[in-house]
Amino acid sequence: MVEHELYHYGVKGMKWGVRRNLRKSTDFQDSKKNVKRYHKKYMESEGAYYNAKKKAEAQFDAKRPYNPNMSKEQHLEWNIDRYVHVLNKSNSSAKNRDRAKQEYKQLLQDTVDKHRNTLVGDIKITERQRQRIDRIIRDELVKDLFKD
């Protein structure tokens, strides 16, 4: 094979630079895309429907709800995945990073609230006691985050 030869794809007599559409109707392609897009798989462990392709590609699904039956380790791993997801979403511009930090703070506050609700339940506590519980929970989350 010579390096300087010029090759042409398609049919003889066809214009150069114009690709011939092998399938005249686009119905097949559209339906194929729709199958990928709308094919959802029921996950019994989470009790919800998820896009099968996305679930296979990434372990983390941002829309997955908080599960109060998670163990502490599973919850911490889930929280870290949420943080990584938020950081990946912010491309690297300072504005996006600031927004990602705010989102993470909100996510962390939500998790602390959920932990507090599971620990305390409907018991009436003072604001000072609530702040103390929140601080203990945050300290535990941070310790577990940076534990080797």
Language-model segment annotations:
Residues M1-D148:
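Long, non-globular targeting/processing and low-complexity regions
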